[in-house]
């Protein structure tokens, strides 16, 4: 069991690890061709969803002090709208970056202190009941990851793939 320095982050740790598993499972078997398909020109494609998921990991890492930058930040930062004129990375490229940044962010989650998590991190939401702290940002990142995995799961079914499996690879420690 991973023991974080912060009691406040204890809820985030298992969710983060499960999201790692879910992300890999929901993308399992999706072809590169299908990953770029949109439904009636109305949906984002799976590559965009996966890229935005990955961008959340980079953003969380940045908030926790990592210097790593998302090589595709220009395509995905803050849920930037899909633009079919852009050349998006392949799922393989995104997965490689996912395996690079995710363990680093996980380590930062284990090391962060309560004091650091209480620091203000303004993102300009302007929602009166949300205190913009690093802890709340971490929670919102996980919420976004949930949402994106659900969207990819729905796209799997629409594109005639089987539903996502909930297998766990115990060798992945992040």
Predicted region positions:
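Hydrophobic alpha-helical core bundles mediating ligand binding, dimerization, or RNAP-core interactions
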Residues: 16, 20, 27, 98, ...
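Acidic/histidine-rich alpha-helical segments that form the ligand environment
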Residues: 82-121, 136-145
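Extreme N-terminal tail/first-helix region
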Residues: 1-17
């Amino acid at each position: 069991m991973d023991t974080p320095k912060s009691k406040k982050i204890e809820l985030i740790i298992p969710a983060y690890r499960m999201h790692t598993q879910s992300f890999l499972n929901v993308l399992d078997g999706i072809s590169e061709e299908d990953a770029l398909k949109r439904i009636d020109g109305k949906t984002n494609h799976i590559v965009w969803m996966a890229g935005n998921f990955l961008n959340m990991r980079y953003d969380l890492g940045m908030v926790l002090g990592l210097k790593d930058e998302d090589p595709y930040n220009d395509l995905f930062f803050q849920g930037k709208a899909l633009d079919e004129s852009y050349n998006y990375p392949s799922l393989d490229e995104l997965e490689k970056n996912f395996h690079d940044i995710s363990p680093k962010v996980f380590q930062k989650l284990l090391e962060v202190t309560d004091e650091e998590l209480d620091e203000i991190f303004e993102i300009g939401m302007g929602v009166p009941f949300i205190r913009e702290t690093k802890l709340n940002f971490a929670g919102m990142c996980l919420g976004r990851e949930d949402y994106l995995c659900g969207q990819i799961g729905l796209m799997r079914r629409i594109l005639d793939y089987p539903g996502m499996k909930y297998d766990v690879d115990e060798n992945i420690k992040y």
